[in-house]
Each structure stands twice: as structure tokens, then as C-alpha cells.
Design a protein with these regions (language model features):
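C-terminal alpha-helical "lid/dimerization" subdomain adjacent to the S-adenosyl-L-methionine
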Residues: 5, 14-20, 134-194
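Residues at the starts of beta-strands that form the adenosine-phosphate
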Residues: 40, 60-61, 86, 134, ...
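Short catalytic micro-motifs in class I SAM-dependent methyltransferases
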Residues: 110-111
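A short glycine-rich, Lys/Arg-flanked "PGG" loop and its adjoining helix->strand segment in the class I
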Residues: 120-131
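Conserved class I S-adenosyl-L-methionine
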Residues: 1-36, 74
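C-terminal lobe and adjacent flexible extensions of AdoMet/dcAdoMet transferase-like proteins
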Residues: 195-200
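A conserved beta-strand element that flanks and buttresses the S-adenosyl-L-methionine
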Residues: 107
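Class I SAM-dependent methyltransferase SAM/SAH-binding core
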Residues: 44-96
Length: 200
């Protein structure tokens, strides 16, 4: 979520490989959203909207929040081009200030491993969720063969994430691996998990 880095990446972000992976992620998230037409979705680290904008026909609204203005510019272009009346973007950097936001469902897709203070961000998102709201996190499974530190990534094990979520106030935590892909993370094979949790 470091703005400058992702500002530089914005125009080259929507590669065929990234689009394909986002469609796989979107399909998995959609399975978690039955009967959600009255729900407001916030995607934290929404980027160019590859995942969040797949959900606009299933929910009341989608708000893409990101700390990269260039990424959000790309997302806004898609929203305008597709005439999506229930989608919008908002610039925000939760590491500096949490904006006044509310949502029934919060999505984080391939964002968690970029966050250094995971516990702090998950606590902030807990306050954004309405009572009964759900947090859906998709990210890479921890693999000791990854050279995380070289690229400044922080990948958590399922147990580590469960503990952080629980301490932040979330309950009904369920984490499951759903996809194994070739060369999907730093040109290495990797698997993806979906973590679901609830704010009671």
C-alpha cells in the first residue's frame, strides 16, 4: 500500500496474468456473497478495480479505497467506461488516518503481504465494518522457500493470521487454500487462501 511504488506500477498493472488471477479470486469471493444485494462493499487496496468491480452486480455498492491515486485513476476510468452507477473510488492511507467509512463487507485481495503493521490495519478495518459485517482476505500462503525480505513482503501463516484477527476482535474465522498457480508470486509457484471472519 505504499503509494509511490504502486503509482509507478499503475499503468502496467493490468497484465493478462494479473487479470486472469483476479478473475479466479473474484470467482472465489462471489461464492461468499449470496444474498448480498443490500450490502455495501469496501475493497481495501482496491487498486485498479480488478477484483472489486467484478462484484457490482451482486451488491448495493462497491467502494475502492487505495493509497495510490494513479491506481484509483485507472479504476475510475473503468467505472466511467462501464457506466457503473454503484461503484466509486476513494483515496485514503490508513497508516496515517482512518477516514469516516462504513461497510457491510470488506475485501482485501493480494494486499495483506504488503502491509507491515498487519494488526493495526485489521483493527482499523474492524471499526469500519458494521455489526455483523464480514472481512474477506485473499493472499498467498506462506512458503518458506519465498525470499520475502528481499521484496519487503510479509506473508503470514494461517495460524498467525487467525491470531491477529482474533486479537483485533473478529470471530468465526475460517481460512482455506483454494488455488495453486504457476509463477503467480514473484515468478514462483504459489497458492492462495481465502480468510473469512465476522464482526459480531
Amino acid at each position: 500500500m505504499e503509494g509511490n511504488t504502486f503509482d509507478e506500477m499503475a499503468k502496467q498493472y493490468d497484465t493478462p496474468e494479473q487479470i486472469e488471477l483476479s478473475e479466479i479470486i473474484g470467482k472465489q469471493i462471489k461464492q461468499e456473497l449470496p444474498d448480498s444485494r443490500s450490502k455495501d462493499v469496501l475493497e481495501y487496496g482496491g487498486g485498479t478495480g480488478l477484483v472489486g468491480l467484478q462484484l457490482t452486480d451482486m451488491v448495493r455498492s462497491v467502494k475502492l479505497v487505495d493509497s495510490s491515486r494513479q491506481m484509483l485513476d485507472m479504476a475510475q476510468e473503468k467505472i466511467s467506461r462501464r457506466s457503473l452507477s454503484n461503484a466509486e473510488v476513494q483515496y485514503a492511507d490508513f497508516t496515517k488516518e482512518t477516514p469516516e467509512l462504513e461497510a457491510d463487507i470488506i475485501i482485501m485481495s493480494l494486499v495483506l503481504h504488503h502491509i507491515h503493521d498487519t494488526a493495526s490495519i485489521l483493527r482499523e478495518l474492524f471499526h469500519v465494518l458494521r455489526p455483523g459485517g464480514r472481512l474477506l482476505i485473499v493472499d498467498f500462503d506462506k512458503d518458506d522457500t519465498f525470499d520475502q525480505h528481499e521484496h519487503n513482503h510479509k506473508i503470514l501463516s494461517h495460524d498467525e493470521l487467525k491470531e491477529i484477527l482474533s486479537e483485533a476482535g473478529y470471530s468465526s474465522i475460517h481460512i482455506q487454500t483454494f488455488y495453486h498457480g504457476k509463477s503467480v508470486f514473484m515468478n514462483q509457484d504459489a497458492s492462495l487462501f481465502l480468510a473469512c471472519s465476522v464482526k459480531e
